[in-house]
Structures are given as structure tokens and as C-alpha cells.
Amino acid sequence: METRNGSFACEPNKAKACFDSIYTEPDPREYYRVLGGLDYVIPDLAKDIFRNLIAALEQLRGRPIKVLDLGCSYGNNAALIRFPLDFARLQQRYVDLQHSNLSTRELITLDRHFFQSWPRHDLAIVGCDVSRPATAYARAVGLIDDAITQNLEQEPLIQSSKDALKGVDLIISTGAIGY
């Protein structure tokens, strides 16, 4: 799998649709426009399962847990786990904002305030994705607590990524494996 212009190539997955262009955007407006138009439902189907697993692990361990989201993209699983949201609501939010004149910096500020306005579950989420713009956005708005931006199919984990993974209790994925 070769990297080109900071995105990932779809060659190993020729049967799958290629969404390279939406993962190189500096914010999630195009991501939600495209995937929302395809009736993308995997995160919604998985969120209650993830929430139940998290609750069970917290009860078992007696402490907040740490989650790794493989293929985290712009943090949609984190948003759905942390807050009473669904994919359609996020999609509508970003489609509505798509035609605004907001810069990415302004959208980051708006989203940071939006997500901070909800009661927060004491949970650490590490996002892992090949898209630096996507993980940077998710981290900047507070959806993920740490980011690993590496192509794990081509390179071994660097030390900072290994450090970020210490103490992970649960690994989830809807964007890298489920489709």
C-alpha cells in the first residue's frame, strides 16, 4: 500500500470503494457529506455495543478505561461513544456547515465548544488512522485524547505510538475493518 500526497492508496482493496479524498481534508465536512449520502450505518450499529463493553470493563476494573479506535478518522466513534449523538445528527451538522464560510480553524473552535458543552464520560480514547488531517482534527476538538498517525500495514510502531497504547483496555474499529 503506497502513500500518495499524505493519503492512502486503495490498491490492496480493489473491491472496496476508494475514499482517499475525504480523509485528506482538514475538517470533516466532506467526510460526512459523502458517507452520509451512502447511508453509512456501521458506527451507529456499533455504538451501543461499544458503550456496553466500556461499561462492563469499567465495572470490572473499577476505573475509567482506555480505548483504542483503529481507523478513527475524524473521531466519529469517539463522538458517538462519549455523547448522545448518532451519525445522522453529526452528518446533518457538517452538511449544514459545508456551505458556510467558516474556516477550518473557526470550525475547530465551534466544535470544541459544541463537544465541551456535553457532560463528559471519564474515558480516554486514543485514535489511530493513516490520515494526519483527520486525527489532528479529532484531537483538536477534544474527541480523542491522543493520536497515532501511522500506516500500520507498512511500518512498525514508533516509540511515541507504543507509549500512547500503554494501558489500552479495549480496541474498537468501524472504519478500518467493518467495511
Spans of features found by a protein language model:
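Conserved acidic residues
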Residues: 65, 145, 166-169
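Short amphipathic alpha-helical segments, especially helix-boundary/capping motifs
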Residues: 23-28, 108-113, 162-164
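A short SAM/SAH-binding and catalytic strip from SAM-dependent methyltransferases
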Residues: 168-179
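Class I SAM-dependent methyltransferase Rossmann-like catalytic core
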Residues: 2-66, 76, 80-97
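Conserved S-adenosyl-L-methionine
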Residues: 68-71
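Short helix-terminating capping/connector loops at secondary-structure junctions
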Residues: 60-64, 116-122, 164-165
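A short acidic, Gly/Pro-enriched loop at the edge of an enzyme's catalytic core
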Residues: 158-170
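Class I SAM-dependent methyltransferase SAM/SAH-binding core
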Residues: 75-156
